[in-house]
Structures are given as structure tokens and as C-alpha cells.
């Protein structure tokens, strides 16, 4: 049978007209080797660093290294089913995670999947895990206070919205306790109608036991703090890749609030374990080790994360993201590699000492080493005036107490200085889960620096403090509102405080 050229032409033309464009064009590569969560893949020469790849088993991976003939992929999660020869497909996208108010009250894993049994998210906003930090022109100076509810911090080491403040100390010194107290303190702002005062919290648990995080979540639920908090969990049993991703996921969730004219607080607990997870990945990728076997870019690992915390300017909506990274030290050695790195990145550090903790001073804050570089600008004038006097009194007390150790005879003024310093130190002690509103902190410290506790026994200081605040709440709530509204201690407020405190001290003396 002889076909005519015109018939062949018509048949081909008809076939081409019926042919749709390729609905999906995918680049496929193959696994050459797999081990310890690292897959070497051949055939994806166009893949880019940070791209998400899809394995034929359904598992995902991130491109970490690009080499001449192959790429190295870090498997997200368990790669048990991936074998040599398994197909790998490009997705041409970077990792995105769900964000938004829908995540409040939920517990998610390192890539944003819910793990609390409350079902999937309905309509979340997906954001990139890795984004550039806001530029200098988008930022504003830190000028709003981030109230922690902890007297020693709000007075001596103040934190502002958009700041990065490191919490550092040995294990079991109360680092997580401080972070949780700060979350609990935000509850009073969420009960008010002022949206600008509300702070949404993200707690990122890296390399912790699931049982520990479960207790923490239970506490947040009991106190009602879970309503404005999201917990991102990458436990000790998770793969190093998930522990590496968890802080960036938490940061992306916080950035949703920052970029939508709201305030967010993200706590990274802790970045020591995050650095260890990254070290593990880097050594498996055969990257050259540097100091303490960490890779050379470990500084960039944390700087690109913490630089995303910012206070945005008016043109960008005045939102903020505050970061509180936690770092665990060994034997109070702050000169180790990771602690020094993060100290140099952050805007200050809260240093907790095990010696103070064992003495019963909680929070076990070393005021001498702790510092806040930008938070003082955010302090209200009332607290700033009180805090300057407290710092001076405490500095003189520590100096005089050290001098008294030599057994020298002290005059009456020096003894008075030591006695007042002891009472001020006692005033700064605080139980866990008991955050103080700023107006109550101001009243307590005002009483301390003006000598109203000088005749009170040190063991009775906490009792005096509780009774005094109760007296103010019942008989003089207006003075508290006045302090909050004016944000400073005027002569009128000062005279009122003196009058009320004198009446209270007199009533105590009469009772005793």
C-alpha cells in the first residue's frame, strides 16, 4: 500500500492539533548512595541549593551541596525506605511552612505539620523557611518595652520589642523557666482590647525530650497561655535535619505576625543543640571541620536566623519580632565557640549562674555579667528612674560586702548600705509562674530604695512585699493606673506613694 505525502501530512497535522502541551515536565535523578540521612543523587544538574526534592518513596529532602556530577541531599525525617537507584524528582520550590493565627494553641513539628491530634490546618498562609532579614531601611530602633514580668530583668536588663536577648547558663539553672514566665506574662495584654499591646509567642524546642515538652504544653494550657502560643517541637529522637530546620520554621511563623503589623516573640530552646545537629550534618557531608569540629559557617547558621528579629518602621507597619535564644554552657564557660558566637550576634545576654541557683536566688541572674544593649531605650521613664537607683544601691552593696569579708569594722552608713542591699537582693527574688505587672514592680522597688524595708527582717521581706501589694490593690488601685497612664513618677505620684507606704508600715507596726 502506497501512502500519499498529502495524507501523511494531514494525519500528522491532525495528531499535532490533538496534542496538548506537556502538563508536567519533571527532571528526574537517581540515588547513587544513601546513609545517615544523606543521599547522593545523580542526574539533577539544574537543582539549586536549598531546593526541595521528592523521592519516589514520598520522602522529601533538601539540596545541601552541589558538586560536578552529583548533588548531596539531606533527607527530611526518616530515609529508611530510600534505596540505591530510587528515583528523585525536582520540585523547583524551596521549603515552605504553614503560618498564621490558625497555628495559635497548636503543637507542630519542624516543618509545620500538626502533631497534637487536633486535625489539619484549614487555611494557613505558607511562607518560606529561609528568607532574607529585613534591610536597615525597613527597620526602626527598639522603642517599645517587652515586659517579662520578672523584676530583675525588667528593671536591670530591660528587653524591647524587636530585640535579640540571649539567655545563657549551665544546665538546670532556670533558663527555660525564665522563657516560660515571659510567655505567661503576655496573658494580661491578650485579655485587654488593645491589639498593639498583644504579643504572640512561638516556643521552639530543639533536641528536648517529648515528655518535658508535654509538661510545658500542659502548663501553658492550664494557665490559658496556649491561646496565643505555638509550640514547634523537634525532639531528641528526631533526625538531625529536623532539629536543624526547627528554629527557621519557628522564625517563619513569627514573621507572619511581624509582617502583618503585630508583635511576636520567638524562643529558641536551645541553639547549642541546634549547632550540634548542624555539625552532625556537616561532618556527614564531609565538610572540613573547624574549631570544636563545627563547620566554618556555623556563625552564619545563627546570624541569618537571629537577624530576622526586627522592629519594623512605620512604612512597614511597625510590627516586631523579638528573639530570645537560649544557650547551654559547660561549667559556666562563656568563652566556648557557640556562646561567644551568639553573644556577638545578640543585643545583650542574661547570664544565669549555678552558684546563685544553689543559694536559692531565683532567677539566678548574675547582674554583673548580664547586659541589655538596646533595651534601656524602650524602658518607661518611671522604671528607668527607679532602676538607676537600684543598680547604684546593688553595686555599692556588692562592693561593700566584699570589703566586709576581710573582717574590717564598718561604720553605721556602710552597715546601712549592706542591710539595704540585702533587702533589695531579696526583693529581686521571684517564684516561677508568678510574673509581676510593671506597675507593681515599680511600687515594690520604690519601697526598697526609699528605705521602707530597712527595719524588716530579711526573712520577712517576701511576706512584706505580698502584703504591701495586696494593700495597694485593695485600698489604692488608682495609683497603679496613674503610673501606667503617665509612665513616669511625678512629684504628685511620688508623694502619694510615700504617704501610702507610711500608712502601710504604720498599720504593720500596730498589728505586731
From Swiss-Prot:
Q: Which UniProt keywords apply?
A: ATP synthesis, ATP-binding, Cell inner membrane, Cell membrane, CF(1), Hydrogen ion transport, Ion transport, Membrane, Nucleotide-binding, Translocase, Transport
User: Do you know which PROSITE patterns this protein is assigned to?
Assistant: ATPASE_ALPHA_BETA
Assigned GO CC terms: plasma membrane; proton-transporting ATP synthase complex
Q: What reaction(s) does this enzyme catalyze?
A: ATP + H2O + 4 H(+)(in) = ADP + phosphate + 5 H(+)(out)
Q: What is the topology of this protein in the membrane according to its UniProt annotation?
A: Peripheral membrane protein
- Read off the InterPro entries from this record: ATP_synth_asu-like_sf, ATP_synth_asu_C, ATP_synth_asu_C_sf, ATP_synth_F1_a_nt-bd_dom, ATP_synth_F1_asu, ATPase_a/bsu_AS, ATPase_F1/V1/A1_a/bsu_N, ATPase_F1/V1/A1_a/bsu_N_sf
Q: Where in the cell is it found?
A: Cell inner membrane
Under which main EC class is this enzyme filed?
translocase
**Assembly description:** F-type ATPases have 2 components, CF(1) - the catalytic core - and CF(0) - the membrane proton channel. CF(1) has five subunits: alpha(3), beta(3), gamma(1), delta(1), epsilon(1). CF(0) has three main subunits: a(1), b(2) and c(9-12). The alpha and beta chains form an alternating ring which encloses part of the gamma chain. CF(1) is attached to CF(0) by a central stalk formed by the gamma and epsilon chains, while a peripheral stalk is formed by the delta and b chains.
Q: What does this protein do?
A: Produces ATP from ADP in the presence of a proton gradient across the membrane. The alpha chain is a regulatory subunit.
UniProt name for this protein: ATP synthase subunit alpha
Q: Which gene encodes it?
A: atpA
